[in-house]
Amino acid sequence: MKTRINDSIQQHQVYPCSYTSIHIVDWKKFTSENLKVHDRVPVNPNTGKLIHSVCLRNDSAMSILVDAFVENALQYSKKKKARQCECVIYPDNYKDTDWVLFVEMKYAENEIAAFRKENDYPNNMIEQIKQTVQFFKDKCILPQEKEVYAIVSFPNLLSAFNSTIFSIDAINDFYLDYGIIIRGTNNAEIISSDNIKLIG
């Protein structure tokens, strides 16, 4: 998987990790840095406050790779690019039967901002996930029939928000149409190389 990604995507940063608690933060809103991976909730150096994250519970300390995309990384050609999510995550010794998780994050300050109609964050985030997964399949990074997981995350929202974004029918339709198991959540649990649970 890593080799196939490297062959198709030049602008990306890979973070190997085996933390039992994996915290993924998009630093663009806080500093000039991009996405980073931490073993604990990080602190904003400008304010001293904790920064909320996407958290992956990894009790077995399994080795995984978090592959973060630089802006405009998914290029079909010089003139055509795919919209992209923040990162893709997968087991270090990936096999095609293993799970793959795509993550898109928005640091909306509160629920009102997250779901304000004119911002249209949920639909934009879902489209970024769809186009990223399609790029991976178009470039043969993933098989066309591969089922994948996806998280639409609002790290600053501490209460459950999946049902605000997706009805049960919408989740089922998304899976049937695109082969993507998607949830609105900030949390997941890595069970094994072929099993991951989206919490929310």
Q: Each predicted region: which residue ranges?
A:
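Short, flexible/disordered intra-domain loops and linkers
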Residues: I112-Y121, A160-S163
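Phosphate/adenylate-binding glycine loop and adjacent helical scaffold
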Residues: K95
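Short secondary-structure capping micro-motifs at structural edges
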Residues: A68-K78, R83-D92, F115-D120, V133, ...
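Electrostatic, structured charged patches in enzyme active sites and in nucleic-acid/phosphate-binding
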Residues: D59, S63, E71-L74, I141-E145, ...
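Catalytic cores of nucleic-acid endonucleases
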Residues: R116-S153
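Short, low-complexity, polybasic intrinsically disordered segments
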Residues: F154-G200
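Basic, amphipathic N-terminal segments that precede the first structured/catalytic domain
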Residues: M1-A82
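Conserved catalytic cores of phosphodiester-cleaving nucleases, focusing on short active-site segments
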Residues: C87-I89, W99-E111
